[in-house]
A protein has these predicted regions:
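Charged, terminal alpha-helix-loop-beta segments
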Residues: 1-152
């Protein structure tokens, strides 16, 4: 879809740009996660066992954790990565609670969290059709969000 700026009743095309690095996407989202997703940012590059989670957030409305993963391009490993991260979260609940307490200074008990509402958000400049179709199943705890960058 093309975008235009309106100036003096004339349309000027807006050029699309690419994010050069995955970190550029990550920084933008982490700084604006409350505005974009109504989530509380907890931690960046959170490590649990052998896994490094890009962004850890908390959904105060649903009392659940949300992991955000960033992809520079369309990767084929989105769904298996999502299930791995969901498994890591559900098998290491105390690590997530401890990270929340350490980063926010607020108390949180295991029984206050609705683990069934936990989810993974993937953000990329594009996803392939297989990835888009794979999240159409009911109750799949994954969301795919495409991000676009435009000049000026």
């Amino acid at each position: 879809m093309d975008l235009y700026n309106l100036k003096n009743n004339m349309l000027e095309p807006v050029d699309r740009e690419s994010f050069k690095l995955e970190k550029d996407i990550q920084g933008l989202i982490e700084n604006n996660v409350e505005t974009l997703f109504n989530l509380e940012f907890i931690s960046t590059e959170f490590t649990v066992g052998d896994f490094r989670l890009d962004s850890l957030c908390f959904d105060n409305e649903n009392n659940s954790f949300v992991i955000i993963e960033y992809k520079k391009g369309s990767s084929y490993s989105v769904i298996d990565q999502g299930y791995s991260y969901m498994s890591v979260m559900l098998n290491n609940k105390s690590d997530f609670i401890l990270e929340y307490i350490e980063k926010t200074g607020k108390s949180l008990k295991k029984n206050e969290i609705d683990w069934s509402q936990s989810r993974i958000i993937f953000i990329s400049q594009s996803f392939n059709s297989y990835q888009k179709n794979s999240v159409n199943f009911k109750d799949v705890p994954f969301e795919l969000w495409e991000i676009k960058k435009y000049s000026n």
